[in-house]
């Protein structure tokens, strides 16, 4: 498996960190329903009355690292990662302006 991009989701969340791994001319489309957001982030959003966009721009929402790989390598990558990590297929890379688009 060739890792084409890697992003550590820290301060700046999805919106600031994911685009750093992308070349010009593509965007990362992240499906928010592709995993269960941990309860602590839901509680923080509700208690602090924080809008969803701000949550994804400030926190990692339970995702510590994002990898970009060839779609043909998804199964092999997931199998390898599940040997010691919790992992999810979050979305895909598409043509577009460099950004992280959450849908």
Predicted regions mapped to residue ranges:
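Glycine-/charge-enriched secondary-structure boundary and capping motifs
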Residues: 1-103
